[in-house]
Curated annotation (Swiss-Prot):
It comes from Pseudophryne guentheri (Guenther's toadlet). Expressed by the skin glands. Belongs to the tachykinin family. This is Kassinin-like peptide K-II. The keyword Magnesium does not apply. It is found in: Secreted.
Length: 11
């Protein structure tokens, strides 16, 4: 499961 922190990095 992807971490929220990494998802923010994509943004």
């Amino acid at each position: 499961q992807p971490n929220p922190d990494e998802f923010v990095g994509l943004m």
